[in-house]
């Protein structure tokens, strides 16, 4: 072999080595941006379903014509993890290749077999009971997935990666310290070899931030502070004579969205700190209560839109941003929408942050002691909730009709507080519709004067917000993304606090605080199916296909702020034929038990022993199910008819349950 041939061979070997190395590097980036950008089908790979946060499934096997045949395949308990007064179950399950990954309010992670519901592995976080910088209950909204790892953000500020097959720890870092006010409640986002997360803590003198880490080893790649420091763009919206920016809030509650084509990442931010006293933080207080766009690879600022200037009402923006592509006046546009605590949708061009549907600055009432902003942004169209009060609650007088943006000082001022909180919205891009899950409340605001400089980790609200003793109601609204007007809207008897998932089968799935999972017709909001689980359904559903069949799964674990019964169950549903329906009767008893506990026990007692105005339920096994179901359906003696309240399948489930109560005591009517 001559020197030329040796040199040529050496060069080829070097090139081959480089190509092999690059191929190995790129093969590690999975799922890739193309997969994560597609509407989910066989898997559900990220919180929100895709990088656009659409919470939309392209599957159609389950649709408006057959959803009434939906039934439980299995239910699994998660070893009692996250059951307790301080916990909430808000996590959306992730699904990959026949395995489901779910995290509880205790930050314990479970891998479940789709086929059987069997627990394949469990990771226990063993959180310290000393964690005290938690705003709104111990919770997690999900895990991230990528490169054969499950990414977990914990309340103690730890971010870690677990092996997807075994649950073994791959790496762990102390991303932030809970003692300084920082916790992680959102699902981490995997994108192009990065794990990206925000941090909660605006009520604890925190300075908001988003960080990106290497998915391979957890090393820090970039940081963006949502409250700018000296010499950074936006710092001039904070006072020059103090260090209010250091404890300025603006934390990020939710999983961001990404547009890979533009190379931008998007999120919205929390309230400034302190929440209710603006006297020490004059200025607009960027980038709090804002939508922010960054370069996804570097974390560099690209644009922002502030929804509330100098927020003193806790009108921040915890609802996840959603991306969509839609024609406006015949021109294709890249859109972004966010449902604010103000009760408005903010619909923007995600390339530059300019409104796609008009937003104008309007003068608002002033309170000099609060250093209030002279104007606030008012989107055109309609709000998805009411923004004023028509009657003053007992013990209060109305100022400015209780309208949003009414300022306050020491004397409590009652205002409308209709909002979209963390429960995610969903977008049907084909229809050009965004569905929003919200609540309507009213609260009296007041400040606490003589603020002392807070240290990170101190409770730092600067006042208070007291809710009126009036029931909180839920609002579910379908909003036209082109006009920002309501297509339909409905009021629920309690707060909408689960998040939403829509499908190409014209369905909208929503959980309820009383334990129901419901399927609505997305076109008009009519209820088509519901199932009573054993605890509050306060997490968005996940929809996927496995072995050619469509499934719906939901975490039924309850919620602190939703005042929902706690639990530890994951439920899996699919379309059942008659034979499978018979097999599911055991699960129907679980549904019947839930219905009984939420409706019947108040009169008949928890175990059917009798109670207020209700006779004992004894020995009903002596009668067949159809007889008992007829009584429930039509009513008897002082018991009202439930035909209009419960579906036929629910009545059957309830009948099956009450027949199991006190079976050894003869029924007086069976003698």
Segment roles from a protein language model:
Residues 76-92, 122-144, 172-187, 204, ...:
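Extracytoplasmic beta-rich repeat domains
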Residues 29-73, 226-233, 393-404, 465-466, ...:
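Blade/loop signatures of beta-propeller domains
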């Amino acid at each position: 072999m001559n020197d030329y041939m040796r040199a040529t061979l050496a060069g080829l070997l070097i090139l081959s080595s480089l190509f092999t190395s690059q191929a190995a590097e790129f093969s590690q980036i999975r799922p890739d941006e193309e997969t994560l950008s597609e509407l989910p089908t066989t898997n559900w790979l990220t919180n929100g379903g895709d990088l656009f946060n659409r919470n939309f499934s392209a599957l159609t096997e389950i649709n408006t014509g057959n959803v009434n045949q939906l039934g439980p395949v299995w239910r699994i308990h998660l070893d009692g993890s996250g059951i307790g007064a301080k916990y909430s179950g808000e996590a959306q399950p992730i699904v990959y290749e026949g395995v489901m990954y779910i995290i509880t309010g205790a930050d314990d992670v479970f891998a479940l077999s789709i086929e059987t519901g069997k627990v394949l592995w469990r990771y226990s976080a063993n959180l310290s009971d000393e964690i005290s910088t938690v705003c709104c209950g111990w919770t997690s909204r999900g895990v991230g997935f990528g490169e054969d790892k499950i990414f977990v953000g914990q309340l103690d500020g730890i971010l870690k990666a677990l092996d997807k097959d075994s649950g073994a720890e791959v790496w762990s870092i102390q991303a932030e310290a809970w003692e300084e006010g920082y916790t992680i409640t959102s699902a981490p986002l995997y994108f192009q070899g990065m794990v990206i997360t925000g941090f909660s803590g605006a009520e604890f003198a925190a300075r908001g931030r988003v960080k990106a880490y290497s998915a391979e080893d957890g090393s820090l790649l970039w940081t963006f502070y949502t409250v700018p420091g000296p010499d950074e763009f936006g710092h001039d919206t904070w006072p020059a004579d103090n260090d209010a920016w250091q404890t300025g809030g603006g934390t990020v509650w939710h999983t961001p969205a990404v547009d890979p084509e533009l190379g931008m990442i998007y999120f919205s931010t929390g309230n400034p700190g302190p929440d209710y006293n603006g006297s020490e933080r004059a200025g607009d207080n960027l980038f709090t209560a804002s939508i922010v766009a960054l370069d996804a690879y570097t974390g560099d600022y690209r644009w922002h839109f502030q929804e509330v200037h100098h927020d003193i009402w806790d009108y921040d923006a915890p609802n996840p941003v959603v991306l969509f592509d839609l024609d406006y006046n015949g021109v294709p546009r890249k859109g972004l929408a966010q449902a604010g605590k103000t009760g408005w949708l903010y619909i923007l061009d995600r390339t530059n942050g300019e409104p796609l549907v008009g937003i104008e600055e309007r003068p608002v009432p002033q309170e000099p002691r609060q250093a209030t902003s002279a104007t606030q942004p008012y989107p055109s169209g309609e709000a998805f909730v009411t923004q004023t009060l028509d009657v003053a609650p007992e013990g209060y007088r109305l100022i400015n009709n209780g309208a949003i943006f009414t300022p306050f000082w020491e004397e409590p001022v009652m205002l409308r507080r209709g909002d979209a909180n963390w429960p995610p919205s969903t977008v049907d891009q084909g229809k050009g519709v965004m569905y929003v899950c919200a609540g309507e409340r009213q609260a009296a605001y007041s400040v606490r004067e003589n603020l002392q400089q807070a240290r990170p980790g101190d409770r730092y609200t600067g006042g208070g917000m007291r809710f009126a003793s009036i029931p909180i109601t839920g609002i579910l609204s379908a909003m036209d993304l082109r006009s920002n007007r309501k297509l339909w809207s409905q009021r629920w008897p309690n707060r909408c606090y689960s998040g939403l998932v829509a499908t190409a089968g014209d369905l909208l799935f929503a959980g309820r605080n009383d334990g129901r999972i419901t399927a609505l017709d997305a076109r008009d909001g009519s209820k088509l199916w519901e199932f009573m689980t054993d605890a509050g359904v306060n997490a968005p559903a996940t929809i996927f296909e496995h072995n050619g069949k469509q499934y719906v799964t939901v975490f039924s674990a309850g919620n602190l702020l939703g005042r929902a019964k706690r639990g530890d169950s994951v439920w899996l549903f699919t379309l059942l034929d008659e034979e499978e329906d018979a097999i599911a009767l055991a699960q129907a008893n679980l549904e019947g038990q839930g219905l009984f506990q939420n409706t019947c026990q108040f009169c008949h007692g928890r175990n059917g022993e009798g109670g207020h105005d209700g006779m004992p339920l004894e020995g009903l096994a002596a009668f067949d199910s159809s007889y008992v179901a007829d009584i429930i359906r039509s009513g008897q003696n002082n018991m009202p008819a439930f035909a209009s309240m419960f579906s036929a399948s629910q009545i059957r489930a309830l009948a099956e349950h009450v027949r199991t109560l006190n079976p050894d005591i003869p029924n007086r009517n069976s003698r």
